[in-house]
Amino acid sequence: MNFIYEKEDIKKKSDNKKVGIDLGAHKLIADSNGNFYGKDLYDVYNRLANKKRGSKKYKKLLTYKKNRVNELCNKFVEDNIDCDIVCENLKNVKHKSSFYKSVNNKLQYWSYRQVIDKIETLSESKGFTLIKVDPSYTSQTCSNCGAVIKANRDGEHYHCSCGLEIDADTNAAINILRRGAYCPSLQKT
């Protein structure tokens, strides 16, 4: 059986409004406007790490996580429908690292790849551009004065000697946005 359908031509947005996003485990998406999506998912990662793989509860929770991530991505795109999106190019992220075993167990459920894939799919259907930039030092750089000091980030808070006090993920999203604004030719999809 074959289906034939007509696909509308998507008109690219002509204005240059952009939003930067920082992807994380505690907040799935933090944007440069100070909005957060998916704060509740870290609890799901914890519960998944404690469930026996293959059990009914594990599979149900995994399905819930996948559906929740899709729901959050759709909400984020709807909230920023008139903006191009600048995100981190996280192609080299490893789930196994020098963290404690318990942290590695939670990180394996982090859905960054699902988020990027979903936003890429939505970018094609909704007509916005997805720009991927190098994530190096975005969470350590002050979005106000540009100082790169690792000690300025204390968990989820960012404090700089210039007087800036901001959520660390919002600070990183602002830095990601700036990289995308100054390098518009980087890896557009």
Describe the residue ranges of each PLM region.
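Positively charged, helix-rich recognition surfaces that bind polyanionic ligands
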Residues: 1-189
